[in-house]
Amino acid sequence: MKAVALALFLAGAANGYTGSAACGQCHQAIAESYKNTAMARSFRAVQPGIRLPEFDGRAFLHQASRQTFTPVTEAGRYLVSRQQSTSGFQPFRMAVDYILGSGDHARSYLHKAPDNALLELPVSWYARRGGYWEMSPGYDRAGHQGFTREVNARCLFCHNAYPQKNKLGEGIDCERCHGPGDQHVKDAKRASIVNPARLPAERSLEVCLQCHLETTSGDLPGSRLRPGRDVFSYRPGEPLGDYQQYLDHAPDAGQGEKFEIVSSAYRMRQAACYRARPEKLGCTACHDVHRQMSRAETVAKTQQVCTSCHAQTQHEPSGDCVNCHMPTRETEDVPHVEMTDHKIGIGLRPFTALVRRDDVPYGGDVVAYYPPGGTVGITTAPPLSPKRKDYTANGQALLRAGKVTAAVAAFRTAVNTRPEVADIRVNLAAALIAQNDYPAAQEQLEEAIRTGPSIEVARGAWLAARKAGAPLPTAREKYDDSLRTQMLSAHSNLGVVLDHMGDHEGAIKEFRRAVECDPSSAAAKQNLRQALTR
């Protein structure tokens, strides 16, 4: 069974990468100025001496979930505490180990779990209006994921250097744009390193597009890796389409004006100015990637770019073309962040975005966006009928009632209905373990790990099923060794195992911990209630 939690410690993301420290030995001035850019500050570990003044002990109440979050500092560590308003349980707390985001717009916070997985904390700090706390992207709803949301390799791809063996980088580094530098360091020859400025215009732009092109963060697969490619296999200078295919809503879906936090390149490619002269209006026409530009410098540079084509204007130049023709406004997917709209245009557009309806699944066609043309081979499923029988919930109820054979049948039906959902296979594995059918449980777990983008559900109570026929006491020992103490699913799963072993007190203890992890979880409270009433 392969490890699938975030690949924090890869066996080396790429041959030939040497690390940006080697670059700074020769390119000292660039290395020094680059340290202050948002890209360089996009990801970092919490080390002694790092100051996060936003962890000031001021509580933040999230009305939808009735949970109060308090960012605090204790003994040199930064933590977020959560208290359920209607719960008598002790507050649940989690420490901050990594900072995601430069802080120019926002900062999110990650915790490193015992198995090296990175978990996103449910609250983030936003820079607008002097700075304030709000829910992290995707969390502003009653049934949010709490402290269990796992950050995967795709999330980190655009926030960090490529990871090396036993080492996670800190921020976008030189080699993300210039490619592997080992040979260049050895040869000290210009030809042995990629310089995006010397690439053809399309290849040069794609160095930026690898991170700054996203069609949507919503309910589509916004992109798909090409067969045989892994997340960290893109090399600057190669055609981006050889690495992955970008996908989008069909043109007639009415989604063309979406404005999201990573929409800069998507919107720029819609602009008439860009379409007229794409070879001239790339990202670096206005942006200096090696240093943090001041507001005045940015205005002056963009003004120069605009007037190089628009020397004759229909109004008195204001000195700041961007202010009117590329206004900033709230993004649809992260409402607390304002970004510059790169779809250069005439006339004001709304500054406040409509809240995107993530609860309404998209049921239309998916098309190839970049590179354009060709077949996609993807169709989105229409919204499920509310009358559809929920076989998973039925199986869980049957398993709690001790009707193991019926539970196995229900979960198998659910798997046949939704084979791509890893959680259902883990539920089936639980029922198979209750039947002492360890080989079948192992098979389901391995398939769950292959199909699931996150394996928090597959690394819990049934880790011992990797060895077919292992007795349950051994399963408990193995699970205790790998237990991720913050996981709702981990405590719930261990509670189920202990309950089947006859250790009811141990099961109650784990069910209590599950409720403390997420007091809003109806399933966790149901498990505890049933265990207490036996």
Sequence positions of predicted segments:
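Primarily the internal scaffold of c-type cytochrome electron-transfer domains
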Residues: A21, A29-S102, S108-A113, P122, ...
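Conserved alpha-helical positions within TPR/SEL1-like repeat arrays
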Residues: T392-Q396, D423-I433, R459-L463, L488-V496, ...
